[in-house]
């Protein structure tokens, strides 16, 4: 795909406690055109990962409409800017019955609740699908009419860039390998804990191989 226009960039500021702040200048890489999907295989997918950043853009509605025509379980991670997504577009995503993957602050903000348990239940009532909430060092919790919990892995936080993306990616991988909900949450917590203990978003080859081996042995 080749587009006319300027590319964007993202500056990541990581503080001494590992917390990060992004300054993003969105370019053509955040845009979407429905005809792009005509050139790729669109057979049924196990999961379709939808990120809030792209949905927020002017072409986000076209993206949501295209995703609605695909066969597969949508997993939606709105991210911290998710509340900037137009309400009608957000409702269109909820109508796809996506798995929601959010952190605690996002769950409270999207639900309008003050406590995490009713917040999760409120989001589940809207989507009718699994809601996953990451809780930092306290692990993660999920709800689909039943509750699932998995403890976190103690670690020294160096850089939180990639914590959420690595968690949702690891969860998807674990589920595809046949792990049950609690096992998948635990594996995702482990991967995320290793990411935040490293500078940048890449694990060493040794870490990657160890995680792959662990996943295959479950």
What are these regions (language model features)?
Residues 5-8:
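Short acidic/glycine-enriched loop/turn segments that link adjacent beta-strands
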Residues 116-218:
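Conserved phosphate-binding/catalytic region of the ribokinase-like
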Residues 1-2, 14-99, 104-148, 179, ...:
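Ribokinase/PfkB-type carbohydrate-kinase core domain
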